Amino acid sequence: MTGRRAPADGPGGGQQVAVQGVLDGMPRRLYPCTPTRLLTWLDCPRRYRFSYLERPAPPKGPPWAHSSLGTSVHTALAAWFALGPRRRTPQRGVELLREKWVREGYRDDAQAAEVRGRAAGWVRDYLEDVDPHTEPLGIERTVSVPTAQLVLSGRVDRIDERRDGSVVIVDYKTGRRPLSDDDARGSLALGVYAVAAARTLRRPCAAVELHHLPTGTVAAAAHSADGLARKVAEAESIAREARAADEAYAAGDTETPFPARPSSMCSWCDFRPACPQGRAAAPHRDPWDAVLAERAGG
């Protein structure tokens, strides 16, 4: 844990943990990173090297339909909130989805149209429950916070203000698996976003939510001061490893710190064509397989 422990009896006290101690002495340059970068390192050092260090990066495989689906929904919802309140209708959300639709990764036009129709239902149902007159504090907002070791940053899907004045981090999800409150509480990214949003907005922020559009469910958690401190400590722990690997790469060791970490997820890796271990560990998947699985799962 960095700095001094923040008081736990006030709202948002945990954010102070992330920034206290920053001026206590910084013998090294702060390491800039995002939760995505840290989690990529944790998942697979080889993929991390391909994603962030090796230039030019190895060629990727074809685009994934499930990634296009997520991008389409996120972009449509962001565009919906950019409208004036009178224009924010569920039907306009469906129209925006059609306008923002990303076609890449689907088997053919018929499959893309079928998935778009399914996603249109998600968006319509979701926006039926959103007050069009409520203005979020941020949409696709970049937030950042320095700690004793890092500069953490990331882009948040939505930052809401509740009627009691509290601030909530909202993350949209479009995958097949429904999410639980434990998923929201355990998410490193959401915890980091809460700390960073508090610093960026100068307001307490301890609540995080995962909005799962396929099921219309919300997984929520309210972090304690200690919980937010643990998220910062977790980020710093992962970053120490990633930074050491970065330095080794810069010094010429491009292999030792970056072993492949084969798993079933290798089927879905962008860099599968460049990784023999990944190809051996998991079967080939067509770019549209995940959206077929989503339909089969209901």
Annotate each language-model stretch with its function.
Residues 75-140, 146:
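A non-catalytic, helix-rich entry segment at domain boundaries
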Residues 38-58, 62-83, 116, 120, ...:
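Nuclease catalytic cores
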Residues 65, 69, 111, 115, ...:
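Hydrophobic (often cysteine-bearing) scaffold residues that line and stabilize catalytic clefts
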Residues 34, 135-141, 152-156, 262:
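Short beta-strand or tight-loop elements
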Residues 45-53, 163-171, 240-244:
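Active-site-adjacent bridging/hinge elements
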Residues 13, 32, 196-298:
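Metal-dependent nuclease catalytic regions and adjoining charged, substrate-binding loops involved
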Residues 141-237:
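Mg2+/Mn2+-dependent nuclease catalytic core
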Residues 1-66, 287-298:
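C-terminal, charged and often intrinsically disordered regions of DNA end-processing helicases
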